[in-house]
A protein has these predicted regions:
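Conserved non-catalytic scaffold segment of RNase H-like nuclease domains
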Residues: 2-133, 148-170
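Conserved beta-strand -> loop -> alpha-helix junction used to position metal-binding or nucleic-acid-contacting
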Residues: 130-143
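Generic alpha-helical structural context detector
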Residues: 141-144, 160, 181-184
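Acidic, divalent-metal-coordinating active-site segment for phosphoryl/phosphodiester hydrolysis
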Residues: 171-184
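Mixed-charge, glycine-rich, non-catalytic linkers/tails in nucleic-acid processing enzymes
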Residues: 186-196
């Protein structure tokens, strides 16, 4: 297993190895903070094996609460799209099975996504101590270490800088795919610079 960074014991150093088998995740939520009651409304992920995309996961989640208009404006996800969709427990059960053969997940600003996945696990299993069970790499850490001079390390900025896309779509699966391409570009840059 790769070296860990300080803080969350699940967090791995993005420069501790050349990851080739991993899952890249992205989430869409009803707000910015689990602590303020925001909930998951979409999980998107891509499974990578030997640097090739081999599987995708994309599920909407019914939070059983209103999706704020600013979230609908950003993601296009509204209340009508979530009616009849599975609840958090059903989706987390399926996501856990889907992730079970891969030890490492990645996300950009992973603490955000992981906090929502931790909360979803806690809600799904009525266990306040439960947590999402995978080690994770934060590509935000990698960007900051590669380019400490940059003012912005947002996905929307980086995907343009690395010529991946013109804009972030703010839908979980498409964002996960962009973050996968971003990780590969930054990892290759780190290798060229002798950082990996």
């Amino acid at each position: 297993m790769a070296a860990r960074r300080s803080g969350d014991p699940r967090r791995l150093d993005p420069l501790s190895g050349r990851f080739t088998d991993y899952i890249v995740i992205d989430t869409e939520t009803t707000g910015l903070s689990v602590r303020k009651g925001a909930r998951l409304i979409e999980i998107g992920a891509v499974k990578i094996h030997n640097d090739e995309l081999v599987d995708e996961f994309d599920h909407l989640i019914n939070p059983f609460e209103h999706v704020p208009s600013r979230i609908t404006g950003l993601t296009g996800i509204d209340d009508s799209m979530l009616l009849g969709k599975p609840d958090v427990r059903e989706v987390m059960d399926e996501f856990a099975r889907w992730c079970s053969d891969t030890a490492v997940v990645m996300a950009h600003n992973a603490s955000f996504d992981i906090s929502f996945l931790d909360n979803a696990v806690q809600l799904a299993y009525a266990d306040r101590d439960a947590r999402f069970a995978h080690h994770f790499v934060d590509t935000l850490d990698l960007s900051r270490r590669l380019h400490p001079e940059k003012r912005s390390h947002k996905v929307s900025t980086l995907i343009v800088d690395y010529h991946i896309a013109d804009m972030e779509e703010h839908r979980a699966l498409s964002d996960a795919k962009q973050e996968w391409m971003l990780y590969r570009a930054m990892r290759d840059e780190a290798e060229l610079l002798g950082m990996l």
